[in-house]
Amino acid sequence: MSRVVVVTTGGTIASVADDRGVLRPARTGAELLGDEGDRGVQVIDMMAKDSSQLTIADWDRIASAISAAVEDGTDGVVITHGTDTLEETALWLELTYDGAAPVVLTGAAKTADAPDADGPTNLRDAVALAGSADAQGLGVLICFGGAVLAPLGTHKGSAGFNGPEVVDRKERPFLGTVSAVAAPRVDVVACYLGADAVALDACVAAGARGVVLEALGAGNAGDLIVEAVQRHCAAGVTVAVSTRVPNGRVAASYGPGRALADAGALVMPRLRPPQARVLLMAALATCSPVGEVVARWG
């Protein structure tokens, strides 16, 4: 029988309505698992947070729990997680974990007290995947709604996740084992009609060593943003260009996008801002060649 460790962090999968109808994480891992808990599954109730309230330090706590489980000989680890930031946690773990035991993140679109709650099915699927010999060596996976997805390029949709499905093997974009808390600050700055450089300048003044632009269209921004990017890139800040458009590639094909690239910004062709930030954090934290990392994995 496979040994699987389930680490709970909260999220919709564990949430129920309180007496005011407000949804809050309240169910334990044992309650979520039901009979499944008697089948070689160990539960670690780490925290009970809405994933919008998770911090960078929580990534280190999750990583430590994974390391301890792997060192203890577990066959796989499941992380229950809120869907708001699951794509960010999954990618950070993917970039910084190189163990053979699979790490599977799952959650739910509906609360634990909903009559048609999807959490129990998602959790059962995730436990089965984590304990499967076929998942050995695949690294970090997202198991949700009957699909198995690679973290890189996955993003939240209205009732689940959109991303590359894992059929057999997948490349693992491991950059190095590092502490999230020790990683350089990387911020996301939104671009919009008439945007100036105030937000970008403020992020750099606050200590950001990297900034992801949530650019317009295929990767465009106004002149004031372009001028600020040129200043900050010249001063050693890494700027990457993503987009606010849900789908499609980013490219320096229009004049403003080319101006950003000429100013020193890196074009993040595939990743949306939340994951672009995570990739930039990991690249800077591991002292990897950022341009090469973005070109290969961005």
Model-based region annotation:
Residues 1-298:
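Active-site histidine-anchored catalytic micro-motif
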